Structure formats: C-alpha cells, structure tokens
Amino acid sequence: MSLSATQKQEVITSYQVHETDTGSADLQVALLTTRISQLTGHLQQNPKDHASRRGLLKMIGRRRRLLSYINSKDSQRYQDLIKRLGIRR
C-alpha cells in the first residue's frame, strides 16, 4: 500500500518547508500520515491482514518519534503541523 507518484508529489508540494525540501521531518510526518490513512482503510476491509497491521504499527511508531523530535525542537511548529494534518496527540 504505497502512495502513487502523483499523490506523493501533492503531499510534498503542500508540506515542504522550502522549495527543494524532500525529506524534512514535517514532510516525513505528512507522508506517513497519508500512508497510515490509506492502510487504515485497507485494514478495515481486510481485518485478517496481519502483515499490513504490523507495517501500520511500525509507521505509527515512526510518526510518533518524528513528532516528538519536532516538538522538542519547535513546539509551535509541532502544534501547527498537528492542526494542519488533523491528527490528535
């Protein structure tokens, strides 16, 4: 369950910090959030897909660590990102 190239590019252009940004923590969190939402839909239709569930939990953990890093560096940027992505934490 990966993102298509057009979906990924849309997320990159809307969340990049500067013009050539392709891997900032904010952008990584946005990409992970998009993948997590897709995988959540897949798991609702396929509840016995345990391999995908494990991948989902790993992505959630990675996103949580990135969000903790952003919060430790700049809490206002963290709050803005959480609000913009619509995730609760």
Swiss-Prot record:
Q: Which GO terms describe its molecular function?
A: rRNA binding; structural constituent of ribosome
Provide the alphabetized UniProt keywords: Ribonucleoprotein, Ribosomal protein, RNA-binding, rRNA-binding
User: Which residues are the signal sequence here?
Assistant: none
- Pfam assignment, any one: Ribosomal_S15
Query: InterPro entries from the xrefs?
Result: Ribosomal_uS15, Ribosomal_uS15_bac-type, uS15_NS1_RNA-bd_sf
Any Gene Ontology biological process: translation
Q: Which GO terms describe its cellular component?
A: cytosolic small ribosomal subunit
Q: Which CDD domains match?
A: Ribosomal_S15p_S13e
**What does the record give as the function of this protein?**
One of the primary rRNA binding proteins, it binds directly to 16S rRNA where it helps nucleate assembly of the platform of the 30S subunit by binding and bridging several RNA helices of the 16S rRNA.
Q: Which PANTHER family match?
A: RIBOSOMAL PROTEIN S15, BACTERIAL AND ORGANELLAR, SMALL RIBOSOMAL SUBUNIT PROTEIN US15M
What's the subunit arrangement here?
Part of the 30S ribosomal subunit. Forms a bridge to the 50S subunit in the 70S ribosome, contacting the 23S rRNA.
Tell me which family the UniProt entry assigns to this protein. Answer: Belongs to the universal ribosomal protein uS15 family.
What NCBIfam families does this protein map onto? S15_bact
Protein name listed in UniProt: Small ribosomal subunit protein uS15
The organism of origin for this protein: Rippkaea orientalis (strain PCC 8801 / RF-1) (Cyanothece sp. (strain PCC 8801))
